Amino acid sequence: MRQGRSRHKGGVPRRNYYRMDGDVGMAYSVGMISLGCEKNRVDAEMMMARLREAGFVLKDDAAGADAAIVNTCGFIESAKAESIEEILELAKLKKEGKIRALIVTGCMAERYREEVRRELPEADAVCGIGADGDIAEIVRRALEGEHPEVFPEKEKLPLEGKRVRSTPPYYTYLKIAEGCDNRCAYCAIPMIRGPYRSREPERIVQEAAELAASGVKELILIAQDVTRYGKDLHDGSRLPELLRRLCRIDGLRWIRLLYCYPDAITDELLDVMASEKKIVKYMDLPLQHCSHEVLRAMHRAGSRGELTELIAKIRARVPGIVLRTTMMVGFPGETADDFNELCEFAKEIKFERLGCFAFSQEEGTDAYDMEDQIPQEEKERRRDILMEQQQTIMQRWGESRVGQTVEVLVEGYDRYAGCWFGRSAADAPEVDGRVFFTAQGGKPRAGEFRKVLLTECLDCDMLGELVG
């Protein structure tokens, strides 16, 4: 797969799918391209497991398979454009006879089902996220010349199941909930994914234990909002208790939290993060903005003062924590003063990690029809200003780490740079930096934890030397 579970009662029965032409006896092959977030990645991994159980041969390169699946993202305009580009590239290969069937699924297919069917006739099958459990039957029908269109209720999206993991063996993502109830004015996720649904804690702990037994050292918890985990369960389960149970699993070394909603951060959660050694001192806390007026228009709570107090409390209760946030600029009605306040806030707080999006006008959201839409050029200008400021902040923070010895999860060797690389607790996969280090007389292995003395910060990556 580029960037899983047993069949449930009443689902499509297990069967093996073979070619019925000159290659009699050879199983059909399937390749998948999964776009977007880590939640989409987990969905793709479960689909691949179902396909493998059904007898399909999985290929890393979708372009070389009998059937190609594009697991699309429909969050913002740039993500939709990337999804369409991938579909058209595969459609070209299909026209050339290099693949037999093209299947489109995921968030964009769920959200724009009519448009996808009308504008992308090259797709042999189009299915929504609730159809993931029946993906093997959908692919079979597409390969046999049918054009299935399957859009069950969103709530039928499997919350758990066997997976063909696409990450390295030493880390993986674990989805603890699906859907969202927050209803932010700019976001289409509740329309696409449905209401918030927590997984049962026993099933999460069981899967985590199985992952640890398979060699996973770093477990990254994900959901649209991890901090609201358990609010829909009747047994009183909440995130702090789930974390305590996960920390008791042998073999796990790091547990990382992504997507923490600011108004759901509790003292109990912070105390667990501070006391449990396996929970890395890192929190992904998407704030979006600090202006009270902009946040109110976004249907989000808070103000600059309240967010400043929250961050001060987090840093006081969890010393040394690394905070990653995401900001949005160019929301309808964002004035020059609002934007300047955001820049001042980011400069004052000095987030260790910060990403920024330009507002994307998404159909069906409350923000789509709002007045005072801001021109795209101005949105991009504001984004660039904030990110340029943040680069300086992150560089200075990195320089302040020089001389520290940190634990690094080794990920590989860069033969061009002539050194090893990995991640510290301050670095989430794919979105943050890396630690590049030399190892005189030693040969670290991927998946090991080693001590590295930090010697330099270069473009927000750290350089260092192996010391243990």
Predicted regions and their residues:
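Contiguous mid-protein beta-loop-alpha structural module that forms a pocket-lining wall or clamp
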Residues: 334, 341, 350-351
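Short glycine-enriched, charge-decorated loop/helix-capping segments at active-site entrances
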Residues: 74-75, 193, 233-236, 296-302, ...
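Conserved, mostly hydrophobic/aromatic
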Residues: 204, 221, 257, 285, ...
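Short, low-complexity intrinsically disordered segments enriched in A/P/G/S/L with frequent Arg
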Residues: 5-7, 11-16
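Conserved SAM/AdoMet-binding glycine-rich loop
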Residues: 102-104, 111, 121, 213-337
